[in-house]
Amino acid sequence: MYNLKMIGVDLTKISRFKNKSEKFAKRILSHEEFEKWEINKDHSFLATRWAIKEAIYKADNNFFEFSKINVKKDNYYWFQNFYISVSHEGDLIIAFVIKKEKNESQN
């Protein structure tokens, strides 16, 4: 018998985030992420966080308030019970997320 793991994928155009407002950034970034973004308002940082959070939401619909998701790498894990992979190519970014099972051990 196979254990079903939930996955989420998001493909985002980085250039879509060039002229996004501070209000938009506050809506999708956690407080810690917003402070980091506010230093130089890097649109690729904003696009990356968007793609990751969209993928997390697609894997688990409980995470619909993006500002409550703080994405940072801590002890090889990005966010709670998720494995996250991100890749950039030109103007595109893709985020791939796998939700870990509760009984799955952390390495």
Swiss-Prot record:
GO terms for cellular component: cytoplasm. It comes from Mycoplasma mobile (strain ATCC 43663 / 163K / NCTC 11711) (Mesomycoplasma mobile). One of its GO terms (molecular function) is holo-[acyl-carrier-protein] synthase activity. It catalyses: apo-[ACP] + CoA = holo-[ACP] + adenosine 3',5'-bisphosphate + H(+). Its EC number is 2.7.8.7. Transmembrane segments: none annotated. It is found in: Cytoplasm. Transfers the 4'-phosphopantetheine moiety from coenzyme A to a Ser of acyl-carrier-protein. It holds the Pfam family ACPS. This is Holo-[acyl-carrier-protein] synthase. InterPro entries: 4-PPantetheinyl_Trfase_dom, 4-PPantetheinyl_Trfase_dom_sf, ACPS, Ppantetheine-prot_Trfase_dom. It is an enzyme of class 2 (transferase). Belongs to the P-Pant transferase superfamily. AcpS family. Keywords: Cytoplasm, Fatty acid biosynthesis, Fatty acid metabolism, Lipid biosynthesis, Lipid metabolism, Magnesium, Metal-binding, Transferase. Mg(2+) binds at D10, E54. One of its GO terms (biological process) is fatty acid biosynthetic process.
